[in-house]
């Protein structure tokens, strides 16, 4: 089975005297992959995302980034806009009507044209994708022997939106059916069964830190290391393990206790 590139944005909003909140989306139960799961905004990387990243009219701060990272950063910004209505590009303020029209155009077109449409839309707004807004956090792909319907290698990026003007957000109604701002600890406590294994591990990693500054510093120290779990047999029971030393507080669990798709 082919491994496809994907990208996700972990949007963070500071709270005075409390842990930061994360924007989480609930996927439509009708989706083939992770239907009904709580996930970060994101989706598949398209070839046109790389073209956007390498176009100085449409992007800034991408010099020195490899192609996979560059394309994934654009895809993370694009998918966040599609699924939530939050446009995290640099440029003149855009009113609600132009943004709504842009989002509708993305929704109406075929999936294969979304990245090209997004490039045209930000060009029309006079906007650019700023690579430095995204902080590399992790890369994940399924275990070699995992029983999954699709295989993705997903880049995860942290984005601090505390100082962003956040207009009312709304799910696209196709991939995402609900949105909420919630802490990592609350997600793990209240929605554990709705979290696929990578999301669960990433939230546990985030929950270790009291604020966004500490989280970003830890992410910079550890880098965006690729994690591929191992599924092994222990006494007739399959267990999932990930490497130690990568800032994840839990590195193993029985497969039967996890949601994998």
Regions found by a protein language model. Give the residues of each.
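N-terminal leader/linker segments that precede catalytic domains of diphosphate-processing enzymes
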Residues: 1-261
């Amino acid at each position: 089975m082919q491994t496809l590139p994907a990208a996700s944005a972990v949007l963070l909003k500071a709270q005075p005297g409390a842990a930061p909140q994360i924007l989480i989306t609930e996927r439509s139960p009708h989706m083939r992959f992770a239907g009904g799961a709580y996930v970060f905004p994101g989706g598949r990387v398209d070839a046109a995302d790389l073209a956007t990243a390498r176009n100085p009219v449409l992007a800034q701060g991408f010099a020195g980034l490899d192609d996979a990272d560059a394309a994934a950063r654009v895809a993370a910004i694009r998918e966040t806009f599609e699924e939530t209505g939050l446009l995290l590009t640099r440029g003149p303020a855009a009113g609600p009507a132009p943004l709504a029209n842009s989002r509708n155009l993305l929704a109406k077109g075929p999936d294969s044209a979304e990245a090209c449409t997004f490039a045209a839309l930000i060009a029309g707004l006079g906007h650019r994708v700023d690579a430095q807004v995204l902080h590399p956090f992790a890369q994940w792909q399924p275990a070699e022997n995992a029983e999954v319907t699709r295989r993705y290698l997903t880049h995860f990026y942290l984005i601090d939106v505390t100082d962003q003007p956040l207009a009312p957000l709304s799910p696209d109604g196709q991939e995402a059916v609900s949105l909420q701002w919630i802490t990592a600890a609350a997600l793990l406590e209240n929605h554990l069964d709705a979290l696929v294994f990578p999301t669960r591990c990433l939230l546990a990693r985030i929950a270790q830190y009291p604020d966004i500054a500490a989280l970003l510093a830890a992410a910079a120290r550890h880098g965006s290391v690729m994690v591929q779990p191992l599924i092994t047999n222990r006494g007739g029971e399959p267990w999932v393990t990930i490497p130690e030393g990568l800032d994840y507080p839990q590195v193993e669990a029985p497969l039967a206790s996890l949601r994998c798709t």
